[in-house]
Regions:
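N-terminal regulatory/effector-sensing and dimerization cores
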Residues: 34-131
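Aromatic/histidine-rich interaction motifs
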Residues: 123-153
Length: 232
């Protein structure tokens, strides 16, 4: 009997997890668009056709696709991601986003979970090896390859939409598990940025919020820097 390699087993597990998560999202989303769920901060989305590029300010979040593909542009950098990847934004960012792969037979499906700085900070306090280093903060958006641990936690969280009575008890525990795996992964540094008050990422996020609130008003760089505790 042929031995199934570890990589093959992992690929089969990811395919099974992805198929179940896609079924949950499609069952919940009867129409195209963004659909909030009963779980605070968790959103499902579905689109049956590619979209034009559109500007949006995206909150700090974790997002993954189970079907379809998307292009995200941040400044002069272009990011392509699909069902093989997850996306992390560690600050509120102005992005140009476009769904590049979707059809009625295979709609664009995915989920997004807003990142809670308090929740991440509490988890970090229990895990000393997750304490931030003095390394410089990188760009606040990144895409990495999905893992069975991350996809499995996201799937368990999504399953809870069918049992609303379990959400208050189980959702925080599953979210903590998901955050643990994200902190342990390639983009752990970006999650740590979310929890660091006064970090460069935190200041950038505050600056974007400050500008959004005063979009139609004249502003001075000195005033902006003072409002978010940044140097010019």
């Amino acid at each position: 009997m042929n031995q199934i390699s570890s990589d093959s087993r992992q690929a089969l597990e990811i395919a099974s997890q992805r198929a179940e998560l896609a079924a949950i999202i499609e069952q919940y989303c009867s129409t195209d668009g963004t659909h909030p769920t009963p779980i605070p901060g968790l959103t499902f989305f579905r689109h049956a056709a590619p979209s034009a590029a559109a500007c949006a300010v995206v909150k700090s979040l974790f997002a993954l696709l189970v079907q379809g593909a998307k292009r995200v542009v941040l400044a002069d950098e272009v990011y392509e991601y699909d069902q093989r990847h997850y996306l992390i934004t560690s600050v509120d960012l102005p992005l140009l986003a476009q769904i590049t792969e979707a059809s009625p037979d295979a709609p664009y499906l995915g989920l997004a979970l807003e990142l809670d700085a308090r929740q991440i900070g509490e988890l970090m306090s229990k895990m000393p090896h997750f304490l931030p280093s003095t390394a410089t903060v990188s760009r606040g958006l990144a895409i990495s390859e999905i893992t069975t641990d991350i996809l499995g936690a996201a799937l368990r969280l999504a399953r809870l939409v069918a049992t609303p009575e379990a959400i208050p008890v189980l959702a925080p525990l599953i979210e903590q598990e998901l955050l643990y795996h994200l902190l342990s992964g390639e983009q752990g540094g970006r999650l740590r940025d979310v929890a660091i008050k006064g970090s460069q990422s935190h200041q950038i996020s505050r600056a974007i919020q400050w500008i959004n609130q005063r979009f139609t008003e004249p502003m001075a760089i000195d005033e902006l820097a003072g409002a978010v505790s940044m140097s010019k």
